Design a protein with these regions (language model features):
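Active-site core segments that coordinate phosphate-bearing ligands/cofactors
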Residues: 1-215
Length: 215
């Protein structure tokens, strides 16, 4: 499943919150702010309290959009707290992926585990548990989970240089990269699965508004 949109909208919200903190005289370390906000999201409701960000900055093939407009939707009864806002923004990073995985599930494609990798997983145990709920499968993160694309490209270069004759990439990674890697695996929590499912239903409804705005 390929998704064009992930954390751009999340990053924009964190930047806005950083500007607010600076306005109040605080010195903001962006890395620490991300960590605090991610951990705060764990206090949010499993369904994000009716707060629904649509994180589309560009088109999305899975949901058939040629362009995107980031939006935030909520009802008068929604619990518009910072914890719910952050949780909803992280959920939205996985929403289109979850839609794509549901399509694969209908085609009887099954998953044993997913490997979480990239800056989204830098704060331990937050995005990892949300992805597990979204994908209905266990998610593993290594100590290097916070490293992004350059790390992956370096691994590919090392594979090209040092692989044994005929050795597949997966075998090389298991032998030379992940053999001694420290990792954690989280299985989906039933309450969070139900919460994400409720969020995803509202997200898909919100896509109707997104489609109208794009047009």
């Amino acid at each position: 499943v390929h998704c064009n949109n992930c954390t751009s909208d999340l990053n924009a919200w964190v930047e806005l919150l950083a500007q607010n903190a600076e306005l109040c005289g605080a010195k903001v370390n962006k890395g620490e702010l991300f960590t605090k906000l991610f951990n705060l999201s764990l206090q949010g409701a499993p369904d994000c309290g009716g707060v629904i960000p649509v994180n589309y900055y560009s088109g999305e093939g899975v949901t058939h959009f040629d362009a995107g407009r980031p939006m935030l939707l909520r009802g008068p009864e929604s619990d518009f707290s910072l914890a719910n806002l952050m949780r909803a923004n992280i959920y939205s990073a996985f929403a289109t992926l979850a839609i794509g995985l549901d399509i694969l599930n209908e085609e009887h494609v099954t998953l044993d585990t997913l490997l979480g990798h990239g800056g989204l997983f830098k704060t331990p145990g937050v995005a990892q548990r949300y992805l597990a709920a979204a994908a209905h499968t266990a998610v593993t993160c290594t100590e290097t989970a916070g490293e992004g694309g350059p790390y992956g490209m370096a691994l590919l270069a090392a594979y090209r240089l040092h692989r044994a004759d005929g050795e597949a990439l997966a075998a090389y990674l298991n032998r030379c990269v992940f053999a001694d890697a420290q990792s954690t695996t989280l299985s989906p929590d039933p309450a969070e699965q139900s919460g994400f499912a409720a969020f995803l239903t509202q997200y898909q409804t919100a896509l109707k508004a997104e489609r109208a705005v794009v047009k």
